[in-house]
Amino acid sequence: MLAQFDVNLVVLLVLLICGLLSQNAAVTIAAGVLIVIKITPLNQFFPYIQAHGLNLGILILTIGVLTPIASGKLSGESILKSFISFKSLVAIAIGLLVAWLGGRGVKLMSSQPDVVAGLLIGTVAGVALLRGVPVGPLIAAGLLSLFIGK
């Protein structure tokens, strides 16, 4: 019986409960979907999800961020004004910094998989308890790369 104990499934169940208790739909849905995949024949798709899930998530996030431009909610005039407003210039600089950190984070997570568990725990805790969003592992890994010099 103990040989069939699946710690990873227990972790996903705990995350599901944390998501429900904190009323965080992202964590609840993600954990629920992964549990269903894990306990069904769909688990054969885990290698594909692991290989492409991050890129797909970034693609969906980018589509969401660019939608106000495509829909016209953010006018061309507003976009042009962003290059002359101090606040917008600072926002552009911060956006550049965060994108750079995310790139460093992807490289670090690929080259040092031993840090991934800690980054994921911190991110999930931040999402579940602090109402954050799950883009944290990339930025956290980017910040970590600055501290450890990678």
Swiss-Prot record:
| Compartments reported by the entry | Cell membrane
| Record-stated family | Belongs to the UPF0756 family.
Q: Which HAMAP family match?
A: UPF0756
Look up the coiled coil feature and give its residue ranges: none
Q: What is the protein's name according to its record?
A: UPF0756 membrane protein ABSDF1616
Its domain of life reads Bacteria
* Signal peptide from the UniProt entry: none
The main location is membrane
Give the keywords, sorted: Cell membrane, Membrane, Transmembrane, Transmembrane helix
Q: Which organism encodes this protein?
A: Acinetobacter baumannii (strain SDF)
TM spans, by residue? 1-21, 45-65, 83-103, 115-135
Pfam families registered for this protein in UniProt? DUF441
Q: How does it sit in the membrane?
A: Multi-pass membrane protein
Provide a GO CC annotation, any one: plasma membrane
Q: Does the keyword Transmembrane apply?
A: yes
